[in-house]
Design a protein with these regions (language model features):
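The feature marks the mature, well-folded catalytic cores of soluble enzymes
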Residues: 2-222
Length: 222
């Protein structure tokens, strides 16, 4: 795929949000209610891991009125020096995009907005200057096409495909760990597009959650 090698996982800065107590009411495909105290500890460990990876960290205030707001990738993505404001699907997340735009938009050269359809960052896999958008219960065709047009205008290439059934987000069960190497669950390994274009590491049955990881410089966070 075209692009600057390593651009996808070479980071100097991170934007995260403080956990909110209302995360216990966050959306879940497994109908789980996470413990706020446990989330605080995991978040603390996450910050330590980011610091060990050499990142500067901007910490946004918690948003109690939005249970899922700790997941800052869903309402916005960053490409080059631009921020693209997305349109989360669920009504409980409708205000997050506007808030994050006001919080960090000033730090970017351009603010672009997906005006139509629904789309969340969890359905977008970035591989250097290429993007794979997975259609899901959270991301529809109209939202994917609108984002695609914005990305192409910035010089990117885009592929739109379907997320397998019963997977919340495209990246719930796949993650980029090198320029052409993707860690995948068994379901994701069957996608023709991924099989034809990338080297895949398939996780064993029962280890699907490990596919939801992130490569940061020389560290892999699971």
């Amino acid at each position: 795929m075209p692009g600057t090698p390593n651009m996808t996982y070479k980071f100097t800065n991170a934007i995260i949000r403080k956990p909110n107590k209302s995360i216990q009411n966050a959306l879940s495909s497994q109908y789980l209610n996470p413990s706020y105290e446990k989330v605080l500890q995991i978040h603390k460990n996450y910050i330590s891991s980011l610091e060990e990876a050499g990142l500067n960290i901007a910490i946004l205030n918690s948003l109690e009125q939005y249970p899922d707001s700790i997941f800052v990738e869903d309402p916005a993505i960053i490409y080059k020096k631009n921020i693209i404001i997305l349109n989360p699907c669920d009504s409980t997340r409708n205000g997050e995009a506007k808030i994050i735009k006001n919080e960090i938009g000033k730090y970017f050269e351009k603010i672009l907005i997906v005006e139509k359809g629904t789309i969340e960052g969890g359905d977008i896999l970035n591989i250097n200057d290429h993007f794979i958008i997975g259609l899901s219960n959270r991301t529809d065709k109209l939202g994917a096409e609108n984002l695609s047009n914005l990305l192409v205008s910035l010089g990117a290439t885009v592929e739109i495909c379907h997320t397998p059934k019963n997977i919340l987000h495209f990246k719930s069960e796949c993650s980029l760990i090198d320029d052409d190497l993707i860690l995948v669950s068994n379901k994701m390994s069957k996608l023709d597009y991924l099989k034809k274009n990338y080297n895949l590491i398939e996780l064993p049955s029962g280890e699907e959650n490990a596919a939801n990881c992130i490569r940061i410089n020389n560290k892999l966070l699971i």
